[in-house]
Amino acid sequence: MKIMDIHTALVSQYLTPASAVLVIIQKKRLRESRRLRITFRQQMRKNQPNILFLQLESFFDPTLVNYLKISEDPIPTFRKLMKEYSSGYYKVPAVGAGTANTEFESITGMSLHYFGPGEYPYKSILKETTCESAPYVLKNLGYSTHAVHNNEANFYGRRSIFPNLGFDTFTSAEYMAEENDKNPLGWTKDEVLTDEIIKCLDSTEGPDYVYTISTQGHGAYPEEQLIDDPEITVTGAATEAQNNQWEYYCNEIHEMDNFVKELTDALADYPEDVILVMYGDHLPTMGLTVEDLKNKYLFQTEYVMWDNFGMEKKKVNLSAYQMAAEVMDRVGIHEGNVFKYHQARRNTKNYQVDLETLQYDLLYGKQYTYDGANPFERTKMRMGIYDTTLDSIQVVSETDHTYYIQGTNFTPSSQVKINGEWYDTVYVNPTKLIITGKELDDFDRLSVVQRSNSSTRKAMTKSHDRAVYALLADSKWKLDSEKSSSDTGSMEETDTALERNPQKIPVEENSTDNQ
């Protein structure tokens, strides 16, 4: 089928009649069409549910491994939810690694099968152009779009790629107050994500799309025993080292399963409708073969489509690139050329052949599907949900020049700059930092910067620069409201923070902001 035939088919055969009428009127660009489109979207916005995707790192059911003997079920919550809600197998484009490619399929509806061998679109085409995606499509219906990831922002280039996928905000580990809650391998635990997801929902009046990428289940899994007195024990593997790897893995995904319970419990009482799709991005890096698995398939995990408003339960197996279209279809959303295509053509003749042609047209061709012009503008994505603010300075000790830096939304990745130079900083809590060893002058200028956890350690965002004389608690330049909210703290709290952080954030020479 030619590209133009696909476009005609999308308009005339595979769209709902109402949608086809809207497309035809839009092509004529009549004034009346704009009014109809606005009215249609206003109707769509009413009572639209929040749509959440939770991509669980290396999460799958280890009881599917033939040779393992596991002392207890590592994922009782996920298994229970699979029985109670829509669920099935989730076909993914990767095994053992390749998180970003499962992510790409789930966000865009495009199949990695039609890219080059070993290609990561995040490292190729998406560095050059925007791309139709669930965030872009839902933004047109009044949704706010958020990404959440408890790892560094620059991993897989997400900080620069997500604006090309239509995200409004990105909360990475650098913007999480609990980013230092680590597992034995140093990955931030997934339990910190519950509050971050709720923050996204609370930050807007309208519906939200939140795509969350977890990290706790990440390898490489240790061959020695790292967990003392593990809750779950594992035997049956060929070597003791492999038993240790599986035992570590099972205990980590058990904690992830507890996080799933905590999150669904929190969302069950949320005052808005919520759909939450949860799935593993790929099998863990354990050298598994087809013969090792009861389901005989390596490129497959499982998903649950949970909700808090009583959707009909369905048992259906899906590919990652089909899931967003399925969710939209379940709630009556028929927008976006790729997603409408899946809704209309899945399980029909030439489905894959035409999908390949459609993807080529959208990413590499002349974009006939969009009348020759890419309609998606790169978003002005903000890092974090809320601004970092610098509100006041408290003198703790004049002897060793110790100060409290007070404000809002600090994290362990916050670092103070004085007159443009990095300064050693100790994180206390989301409203308090400590600096010590330098006497501040009234006219010194301070800011609090969120620094990347990547090797570059570049600045990502910062508070406004403010002069010391305007920040001191007794300054005549401070507003009355700022004075009344100042908290002098205690030396005991300072000592505790310094003991908890014996290694201060290092000062890096010749660093430059990347604003």
Tell me the role of every PLM-derived stretch:
Residues 1-55:
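Membrane-interface segments at or immediately adjacent to transmembrane helices
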